[in-house]
Amino acid sequence: PEQNLLIKGLRLIREHYALPHLYISLHKQIPSGAGLGGGSSDAAHTMKSLNQMFNLGLSDNELEERVTGLGADCPFFVRNRPVFATGIGNIFTPIGLSLSDWHLVLVKPDIFVSTKEAYARISPRRPETPITDIIRRPVEEWKDLLTNDFEEGVFALHPEIADIKARLYDQGAAYASMSGSGSSVFGLFRTVPEETDMRRLFPESFYFQALL
């Protein structure tokens, strides 16, 4: 428990503010080892909640600065908005991106991807077209332009993850990608996929589907 990001976030707040004894219950629905920032979002939301509950008066900028010490991706979860991240992932530029009315399919196989190993295998490349320009284009044009540099190394280790991405495209996804360092893969669909059929394609995986 002492290494839990949620507990670390609570400690960060307690370094500067006197809080009463607390009972915190976490109902975790984001799968672990999925490349979805589950632990980081838990920590960020805990600090946001404490700020609101006890009227600590911390601005979003201050919260982002404080949670950076818990992990490079923690600040991203302080605000619910699309951003372009630079630095170590903690310097944000808001972007005008809306995926409203797109259908999201998320598939997380029973595979754990070591973040350390994923980083060791990465070959970063500067895209020919800046990412900020790519995302201004229609989603249907992202497929060959918007890439995840982690995929090459992770797919070599776990071809099953590459297969999930291919199957999402086969089922009509306009865009599909591994999330972060894996192992989950998401697809964006213009029309709603038949959920029963989709679940049959991924019987051993965590499956989630939603309208954005």
Ranges and model annotations:
Residues 22-35, 172-176:
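Short pre-catalytic strand/loop immediately N-terminal to key active-site residues, enriched for Gly-Thr
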Residues 186-188:
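Short hydrophobic/aromatic beta-strand micro-patches
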Residues 6-9, 39, 107, 118, ...:
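Residue-level signal for inorganic ion chemistry
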Residues 1-20, 31, 120, 140:
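N-terminal beta-alpha supersecondary unit
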Residues 78-175, 190-202, 208-212:
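Conserved, helical-rich catalytic subdomain that frames metal- and/or nucleotide-binding sites
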Residues 36-42, 174-183:
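Short glycine/threonine-rich catalytic loop with a Thr-x-Gly-x-Asp
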Residues 56-94:
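Glycine/threonine-rich beta-strand-loop-alpha-helix active-site module
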Residues 34-62:
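DPxDG-like acidic metal-binding loop motif
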